[in-house]
């Protein structure tokens, strides 16, 4: 990728949707959210079908991708889609995130059994899910069970921590990706960037302004944040610095008045929260992408999404694999060669 393109130019070039170049390859997106993962696949030429339980997110998906997104609470055994080539998704990550207390499989929000059930019933060529990096550590035993179950279904499995900043996203966002495949898989190569895109590249036109309805941090908020940062031994305030990529966007630090909320330092010394559009740009949603719902709902949709630029890089690897499928499976080495033989549930 050339840095001669501005971030905006690159974003709109990569995520342009062209109905004339859609292939016959169908992607089923479970726990689809507002469609960040699907947007990357749609931009790579796939047809997409989404399922999402939250009405605002499902409406956002349909409005922008113009492919169906069914607003339903998913259940095991549910009829979804005939013969998808690929299944993707972001099963709720709260069971494995620090913010969600890392309860793992004991958490009723765990959507992975539903995701695995869909793979077992529809047998796609490739299935990919994204989750927080905490799943690889505190909940590693559960991850091993998932890998073992996928291998029992005759899939090969590969796992990788991927940082979105290496794929053109102006944000340091590390997430776990798990790929189940039948014949072959190659991870997308990181973009060759002389300098990663920065927060300033994404929001330079608004960062020093006071937009209508701007929400400023109150003195009590600033005092609370100051105590938190002192206790955490922060070297410098955790503002958004325009000359480097932004830190990870989450539902918590976008919508909540919390100690680690994302905020901008204005020239007059005041601090304000990000706007929805600024957050969307930092997550690599183009400006034509319209979100539905209240401000809090829109922030949550953005914080939960797979960055579309990263999603497209993955989609291109999937498409290359499906279009150049080898005649025989490649050599396979399990990521957990001595997995615990525990039942998956």
From Swiss-Prot:
Active site: 93
InterPro entries: C5-Methyltransferase, C5_DNA_meth_AS, C5_MeTfrase, SAM-dependent_MTases_sf
Keyword DNA-binding among UniProt keywords: yes
Catalytic activity: a 2'-deoxycytidine in DNA + S-adenosyl-L-methionine = a 5-methyl-2'-deoxycytidine in DNA + S-adenosyl-L-homocysteine + H(+)
Keywords: DNA-binding, Methyltransferase, Restriction system, S-adenosyl-L-methionine, Transferase
Pfam hit, one: DNA_methylase
PROSITE patterns: C5_MTASE_1, SAM_MT_C5
Gene3D superfamilies in the record: DNA Methylase, subunit A, domain 2, Vaccinia Virus protein VP39
MF annotations from Gene Ontology: DNA (cytosine-5-)-methyltransferase activity; DNA binding
EC number of the protein: 2.1.1.37
Residue intervals of the SAM-dependent MTase C5-type domain: 25-325
GO biological-process terms attached to the record: DNA restriction-modification system; methylation; negative regulation of gene expression via chromosomal CpG island methylation
Family: Belongs to the class I-like SAM-binding methyltransferase superfamily. C5-methyltransferase family.
Protein name in UniProt: Type II methyltransferase M.AplI
